[in-house]
Design a protein with these regions (language model features):
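A short secondary-structure junction signal
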Residues: 64-69
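Conserved catalytic core of two-metal-ion nucleotidyltransferases
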Residues: 2-62, 81-90, 98-177, 183-213
Length: 213
């Protein structure tokens, strides 16, 4: 409700719903005056500007059985919300996902993903002993971060301004990325996200006809 009232029209908030699926698991905010066309979205009619990912954090239940349930629901959510076949997580997951999506009509996919979302996010502070990421893929889904890392924030300089970061940023980054202050070897310094076209000076509208949509 707040976005249409207060946001700059230059930016587009994208979130999948019953009638629109952008193949992400989370909200993205896109700059309509730039271009960053992802391979998995090239056939979609949406603003293909540079995206800022808004990744949610959820509580990590302390009960091991509940944690296993949470992960199962998160995997179900991932499949039916993105509605794409995962290509990088093994043949079993790839073909199992393809079969499940093929057997499930689109209206039912939405109902399944909303049920899964409700179940995986139902845990609160009292029944949890950590924080996790359920919308960043199976790898990050395994991570457990200290609750205290996100109980406050601090402001640090960033490109001429100051931005808030979690007070426990070091614990988070170390868990997620290892020795994050040391650059990886040269052969590992490659992008992890593909783009068909990337242009920070021109709007995606100038590239109409050069990609799938």
């Amino acid at each position: 409700e707040l976005w249409p009232r207060y946001a700059d029209e230059r930016y587009f908030l994208s979130k999948s719903n019953k009638d629109f699926v952008d193949r992400n698991l989370f909200i993205t905010i896109r700059d309509k005056e730039t271009t960053c066309i992802k391979p998995y979205q090239k056939d979609l009619d949406l603003p293909h500007g540079l995206a800022l990912d808004v990744l949610p954090l959820d509580y990590y239940p302390k009960n091991p059985a509940e944690r296993k349930k949470q992960v199962r629901w998160a995997l179900i959510y991932s499949l039916f919300c993105a509605q794409t076949v995962p290509e990088k997580h093994g043949a079993i997951m790839k073909w199992g996902s393809r079969i499940l999506l093929g057997l499930t009509p689109k209206p039912l996919r939405y109902r399944i993903w909303k049920k899964a979302e409700k179940e995986m996010t139902k845990y609160g502070l009292a029944e949890s002993d950590g924080i996790t990421e359920l919308c960043s893929g199976p790898g990050y889904m395994r991570n457990k971060y200290p609750i205290a890392s996100f109980e406050d924030n601090l402001f640090l300089p960033f490109e001429g301004t100051e931005m808030p970061i979690p007070v426990g940023y070091d614990a988070y980054l170390s868990t997620a990325f290892g020795v994050y202050m040391t650059p990886p070897p040269a052969d590992k310094q490659v992008p992890h996200h593909d783009a068909i076209i990337a242009d920070m000076d021109k709007s995606y509208t100038e590239y109409k006809g050069e990609y799938g949509a």
